[in-house]
Structure formats: structure tokens, C-alpha cells
Amino acid sequence: MGPRGDVILEADWVIGEFMKTLEQEGILENTLIVFSSDNGPVLNDGYYDDAVEKIGNHDPKGGLRGGKYSIFEAGTRVPFITYWKGKIKP
């Protein structure tokens, strides 16, 4: 699948094992799980690594203004996912 696909598959497996362990230990209902990310993308960081050229038409900031080191949306918003069995509805 390539590096990104491989990481996604590995993360999926590890998270599944983690969830199974919480369930087996009887603590899943008392555990709030939060997955978060770093704030904002940075491509033009002063290093010439072809990052800007390799990205093509992809917009890592999702159309938002700014980026890392910026006070605008793409620099301050942080995506996250939460799970809490029986407490947070999907």
C-alpha cells in the first residue's frame, strides 16, 4: 500500500487491539479515548525537500486561511475524534 497506507493499516490494528484490551479488562465504559492531531500544516519550512511540489493539487489546510505559526483557522484549529462507550453517541 505504500508508507501512508501501511501506517493507516497498522494504526487500525493497534487501536483495535487497544479497544479489545480495554473491553476485556472491563474498563472501556470508564475510559474516554481522544485522538488528536497537531495544529496546522507547514510545507514551506525553509528546507528544500520538494514538499510543495509533491503535494500537487492537495490542500492540507482544507481551504482554511493560514497554517502552522498562524493565528488564522488553519493554524489554530486542531482536529480530534472522541469515543466513550455509552456516553458519546457516534
Language model features by range: what are they?
Residues 10-48:
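Metal-dependent active-site segment of extracytoplasmic phospho-/sulfohydrolases and closely related
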Residues 16-25, 50-90:
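Substrate-binding rim/cap in mid-to-C-terminal beta-strand-loop elements of soluble/periplasmic
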Residues 1-10:
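The substrate-binding groove and active-site-proximal loops of carbohydrate-active enzymes
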